[in-house]
Amino acid sequence: MNPLHADKPHPTVQWLDDDGATQQADWRSLAGHPPPAKVVLAGDDLGADAAYRLLSAGTGVLWLGDYQNARHLLQALGRRLDKRQARPTQAAASPTADLKAAFFSQRAAQAERARILGGVLLPFDADHGVPLRRAPDVRAAGLQAHGPVTSHYVQSLRELLGVVGAFEWRRKGVPIPALDAAIHPHHGVYSPVRGEYVDLVAQAPLSVAAHAHGAFDIGTGTGVLAAVLARRGLAVVATDLSPAALACAADNARRLGLPRQIVLKSADLFPPGQAGLIVCNPPWVPAPAGSSLEAAVYDPDSRMLRGFLAGL
């Protein structure tokens, strides 16, 4: 079995059914969020105001009604949160303090939004199907994200939408003009949708040392920079700590016909040895990441950037 999809023990969620009996299912969150401490059943008669009160209090809502109505509920909750977060706040004492306060206020609002919207839950069968009226067939997307499972489970609707979106990104790929091909991001791996940094690597002059001693790609992610350098004739060692990123980079190297030019290593920044060229597209916001995907953007205390500079 792929270690990325090893079916490890999961937390569980419990609720009372219509007869008052306790029911239980595995809880699955690819982002690593804990399950709600309390879960209640809900259906098409639950309005957005009542749902908002439950979710704000930390109660998860396990939806058993029409799937499309669950999506409408999620959209209505999002609009309520947008209105609340648009209210003006008290100005800070200085411009610097104002920027800092605004940043952390936005982060707190994003976390609260994610918590509330993440409380709308769906049941899943062991084949990753959603046993609700008008539910789409998401079994292939679920299998790709979770791997095989052995029992039914509960997951948030919001995360399911992310799983389906990632499935489509991976299937279609992201066009990379510098490669004249597509890169296929996996779930939880940052997608190279903005290509300015890719173009810089594609157009930068390569030194004699780079051709002689190869290149390191630190924090390779999808492997897009490693692929660009390999296409330019360099031997590349690409590193990452994320198993999902390494699997994604290996998949892209294979798709592009570059598995021999790119060596992938699990490492915290630098691999052993030296290289004639080192590239890195580090996270740039010095704040905690809320998920594996955000780790491509948020770098607590600039840990990766400091480590990269110290290791040069």
For each feature predicted by the language model, list its residue ranges.
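A short, flexible beta-alpha/helix-coil linker loop
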Residues: 183, 289-292
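Residue-level signal for the nucleotide or nucleotide-sugar donor/cofactor binding architecture
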Residues: 192, 244, 299-303
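Charged catalytic carboxylate motif
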Residues: 112, 116, 248, 304-307
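Short amphipathic alpha-helical segments and helix-helix/interface helices
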Residues: 117-118, 202, 309-312
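Glycine-rich S-adenosyl-L-methionine
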Residues: 292-312
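N-terminal auxiliary segments of SAM/dcSAM-dependent transferases
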Residues: 2-32, 36-174
